[in-house]
Amino acid sequence: MRACPTFLSRGLLALWIGLTVLACSHPGAASAADDAARHVAIQFSFDRPIEASMAPFFMAAKDGLFGAEHLVVSFNSAAGSPDALARIARGDIDLALVDINELIRFRDRTDAAPIKAVFVLFNRAPYAIVARRSRGIHTLSDLEGKTVGVADSDLSIRLWPALAHQNGVNAAHVRFYKMSAAVREPILSAGQVDAVAGFSYLSAVNLRDRGVPADDLAVLRYADYGCEAYGFAVVVNPSFAASKPDAVKGFVRALIGGLNATVKEPERAVDEVVSRMEDGVRDLELARLSTVLADNILTDEVRRNGLGGVDPVRFDRAIAQIAQDFKFRRRPATSDIFDEQFLPPMAGRLIN
C-alpha cells in the first residue's frame, strides 16, 4: 500500500523533469506560456450599444495596447448605467463605462458597494436639449411654454432643475412628454414635440440623418449654460481594484493610448467602431466622433490638466447641482467617487 505514494511521487518527478527538458529545448514555448500566465482577463461593459464615442477602447484593443499591458479585454453592453453599476457591484464584470452622475447617486444608497471611477472619459457631460428653431426655440429661455420629449431612461433630465434655476427658466412652464428612447428623434422630426432631452452627439446627428436641416436644430448643451457635470467614466469593481491594481493602471494607460490614436486617426477609429456594430453607418459615426471629441473630451480643462482626471472644486460644484434634484443622505466628497491613484502622471495624460 505504501508503494502507491512513492509511485505517484516518482511519476510527478518524471513529469516535472520532462517538462523542464521540453522548456529548455524550446525556450520560446516556455516564454509564451509564462507570458500567457501573466495576462489578466478583464470583463468590460459599456452602458449602452456601441457608438463612436467608444472608439478609444476599440483602438486600444486593435493596436495591441491592452495586450502590451498583459491584459485580455472582453467587451459587452449593459442596459444603461444603473445596470452596468449593478453588474460591477455583483462582480459579474470588472470594469465599466457609466455616467459618473449616476455613480454619485448610486453611492448614496445604504447598501451600495464602494465603487469608484478611475478615469473620466467625458470631461463635459453630453446632456442637451435638442430643439427645432422653426418652433421658436433658440436659447434655453425659449423652452417656456414648449413641450420637451424625454425618454424613460434619460439621465440628463435629472439635472434640468439645477439648469433651469441657474438660467432663470420657470421650470413649471416647460411641459415634458414621456416616451421610449426608440421614438425620441422620430417624434421630434415629425413635429409632435418642440424639443427632446438627450445627448448632444447622439440626438443631433440622428435628427440630421432623419432629414431635419442642420440650421433648424438648436443644440442647447447643458455645459454651455453652466452645468458643471462630468460625463462618462470608467469604474472598477472594488475587489478587482484591490487585488489587481496594476491591471487597472495598465487598462488606463492603454485607454489613453487608444484615445490619442483616435484623435490622430479618427477615420480609422470609426472604421473600427463600425466593424463592431450590427448596422453602423460610417458617415454618421464619423460625425458623432467629431462632435464628441470637440464638445466633451478635448476640452480646455483636459488640454491644461491632461486626460482622465477631475478638478475637485468643479466636482464639488457638480455635486451641488445634483443635490437640487436628489436628496443625499450624506453629500459625498470627490475622493468618495473618484480614485486618482490609477492615473499615470500628468505627462502621460497629455494629448499628443
Regions found by a protein language model. Give the residues of each.
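Pocket-lining segment of extracytoplasmic ligand-binding domains
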Residues: 177, 183-187, 192-282
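Conserved C-terminal helix/tail region of periplasmic/extracytoplasmic solute-binding proteins
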Residues: 315-352
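Short, glycine-/small- and polar/acidic-enriched structural segments
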Residues: 34-190, 194-201, 220-222, 227
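Bacterial N-terminal signal peptides
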Residues: 11-23
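N-terminal secretory signal peptides that target proteins for export/translocation
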Residues: 1-8
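Boundary at the C-terminal end of the N-terminal hydrophobic targeting segment
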Residues: 29-32
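Secondary-structure end/capping motifs
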Residues: 243-327
